[in-house]
């Protein structure tokens, strides 16, 4: 009986994660108390940070909330930080939690409008370079005001929808009936080459769209969660943030868009594949049927969502309230005027954001450990000991390298908190503090496109239903992101070092 119970517990521990991963996490949990007793809290604190970064890097094996949460519960039990310190961190960063709770849910109710826009662009533009540029620009613009995860989710929804239609037609089934999209056994030989080409076409569009969310997300206060966190620490509103970051974000945005066009024209790194004409004909016929069947209520819903989007942009620009509260207003407006009154439909809007919100609380627990043990103080002191003109570039590199393997919200939280503490202690002027804040913000946003680990939108794309269908693997995503990483990361460093 005891063996079966032990086996069942081992099997259920961290669910479907690989055995080696479960063993590593268990080893961490056993090792930490021993390290604390023998080597002290500072060494153990650094080990804990590395362990937590490991859980973020292995996000495809297991969502980091569970293993990271276990490590931080242990840290609390070992008194490496206190519940009171964690609560203070949460209070201090409450605007970020509000953003994730309400803004992401609010944008969920705009999905029909966003899906409508992306679908029109996909079928209305024949030039692949222009189409890719439009996807990148629209993703960047939307991510500057909305949530990058939601924008990515909309692009994925459009891609899944179009892929499903053509896959069913290629398999000889009704495009409006459910079928197994993950199997090509029934795909007719005539359509196989077109299907493979369509997969490559969708891969490139999705990558352009995902990069677009990073290009736009760095620009504004609400573009990424870490932006709001940094803006909150600095006391910047929407317009303030945009203007402070613009010397870096605007040149990088322009360079990113030029890169998008060049990749398509030169057909490098897996880009440049065109949509097969037979696929276009099938999708256009399907879209025409949808337009003809659209009801008056659905048309009204699109108008309401469009008006709500305009109100959202105006409210953000004028900073009439905290960002999360504006998101709550969007929820109320759209649901009230489109007749969504069922609490189960409302609840689905919060499903995407709440796991990451919970993970963010774990981030703040790690930050509380770092504060209490003063882990990053020597590193920040070393950076601040450099000549002032070298400090922004060095912080940018430090943030960029760590953000590429870890989560950029976590990295930004650590660095902005430590730099602000140095400012409070009188180690720098307000002007220099603002320069370092911009370096931290851009350092966590731009080089992190290198891997899916750094950008939540990239990780979301990699773990979505569309990735296996279009053969988008981790390695292929890194390869396709490489030119963007070099251009955005390199120009970002140059701008931070010489233009701020």
From Swiss-Prot:
Provide the protein's localization.
Cell inner membrane
This chain's protein is named Na(+)/H(+) antiporter NhaB
- Protein source organism: Pseudomonas entomophila (strain L48)
> Which GO MF term does the entry hold, naming one?
sodium:proton antiporter activity
* This protein's encoding gene: nhaB
Q: Which residues cross the membrane?
A: 34-54, 58-78, 96-116, 129-149, 150-170, 205-225, 241-261, 311-331, 350-370, 394-414, 450-470, 477-497
**Topological relation to the membrane, as annotated:** Multi-pass membrane protein
Q: Which family does it belong to?
A: Belongs to the NhaB Na(+)/H(+) (TC 2.A.34) antiporter family.
Q: Which domain of life is it from?
A: Bacteria
Keywords from the UniProt entry: Antiport, Cell inner membrane, Cell membrane, Ion transport, Membrane, Sodium, Sodium transport, Transmembrane, Transmembrane helix, Transport
Function description = Na(+)/H(+) antiporter that extrudes sodium in exchange for external protons.
Query: Which InterPro entries does the UniProt record give?
Result: Na+/H+_antiporter_NhaB
Q: Which GO terms describe its cellular component?
A: plasma membrane
Record's catalysed reaction(s): 2 Na(+)(in) + 3 H(+)(out) = 2 Na(+)(out) + 3 H(+)(in)
Q: What is its main location?
A: membrane
């Amino acid at each position: 009986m005891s063996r079966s119970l032990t086996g069942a517990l081992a099997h259920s521990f961290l669910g479907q994660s690989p055995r080696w991963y479960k063993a590593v996490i268990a080893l961490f949990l056993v090792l930490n108390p021993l390290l604390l007793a023998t080597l002290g809290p500072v060494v153990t604190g650094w080990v804990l940070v590395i362990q937590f970064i490991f859980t973020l890097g292995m996000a495809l094996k297991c969502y980091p909330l569970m293993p990271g949460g276990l490590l931080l519960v242990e840290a609390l039990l070992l008194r490496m930080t206190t519940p009171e310190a964690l609560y203070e961190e949460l209070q201090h960063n409450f605007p970020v939690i509000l953003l994730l709770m309400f803004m992401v849910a609010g944008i969920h109710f705009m999905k029909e409008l966003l899906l409508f826009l992306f679908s029109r662009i996909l079928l209305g533009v024949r030039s692949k370079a222009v189409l890719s540029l439009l996807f990148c620009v629209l993703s960047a613009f939307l991510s500057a005001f909305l949530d990058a995860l939601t924008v990515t989710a909309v692009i994925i929804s459009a891609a899944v929808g179009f892929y499903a239609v053509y896959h069913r037609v290629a398999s000889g089934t009704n495009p409006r009936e459910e079928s197994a999209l993950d199997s090509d056994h029934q795909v007719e030989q005539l359509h196989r080459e077109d299907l493979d080409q369509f997969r490559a076409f969708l891969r490139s569009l999705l990558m352009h769209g995902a990069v677009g969310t990073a290009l736009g997300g760095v620009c504004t206060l609400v573009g990424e969660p870490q932006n709001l966190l940094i803006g909150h620490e600095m006391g910047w509103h929407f317009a303030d943030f945009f203007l402070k970051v613009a010397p870096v974000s605007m040149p990088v945005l322009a360079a990113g868009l030029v890169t998008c066009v060049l990749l398509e024209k030169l057909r490098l790194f897996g880009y440049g594949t065109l949509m097969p004409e037979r696929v276009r004909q099938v999708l256009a016929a399907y879209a025409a049927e949808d337009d003809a069947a659209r009801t008056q209520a659905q048309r009204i819903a699109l108008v309401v969502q469009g008006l709500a989007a305009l109100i959202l942009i105006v409210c953000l620009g004028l900073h009439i309230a905290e960002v999360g509260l504006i998101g709550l207003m969007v929820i109320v407006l759209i649901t009230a005027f489109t007749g969504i009154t069922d609490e189960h439909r409302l609840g689905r809007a919060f499903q995407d954001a709440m796991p990451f919100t919970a993970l963010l609380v774990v981030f703040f627990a790690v930050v509380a450990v770092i504060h209490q043990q003063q882990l990053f103080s020597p590193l920040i002191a070393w950076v601040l000991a450099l000549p002032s003109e070298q400090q922004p570039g060095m912080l940018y590199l430090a943030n960029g390298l760590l953000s590429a393997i870890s989560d950029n919200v976590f990295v930004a939280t650590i660095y902005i908190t430590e730099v602000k503490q140095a400012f409070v202690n009188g180690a720098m002027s307000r002007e220099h503090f603002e320069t370092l804040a911009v370096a931290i913000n851009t350092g966590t946003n731009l080089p992190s496109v290198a891997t899916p680990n750094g950008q939540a939108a990239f990780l979301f794309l990699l773990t979505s239903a569309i990735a296996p269908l279009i053969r988008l693997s981790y390695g292929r995503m890194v390869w396709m992101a490489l030119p963007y990483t070099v251009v955005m990361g390199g120009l970002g460093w140059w701008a931070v070092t010489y233009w701020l």
